[in-house]
Amino acid sequence: MNKMTEPKFAVGDRVIYNPKRTGNGWLAGEHGTVIYVDNTEAAYTVEFDVPVAEGNTDYRARANEIEPKPWHGWFCKEENLEAEA
């Protein structure tokens, strides 16, 4: 497995959506849990603790470019962000 497709997170990891990302600003700062890891694309499906949109009962959102370091991608691990504080 090369560096591009090496999983950064595992199922069950707690993550926070990057509040600085503007593409999906409505998710800024939201917490969630990784529920699926696609090892082929290093993509993840995150189930958020709150609905991703008003009236939306599907709390899942898929994102690529996830990095474990705070805000070097769409998400970071909760524990990594807490360690930076």
Task: Please give the residue ranges for each predicted region.
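Generic beta-strand structural signal
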Residues: A10, V37-N39, A83
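Intrinsically disordered, low-complexity, charged/polar segments
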Residues: D49-A85
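Short aromatic-glycine-enriched beta-strand elements
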Residues: E41-T45
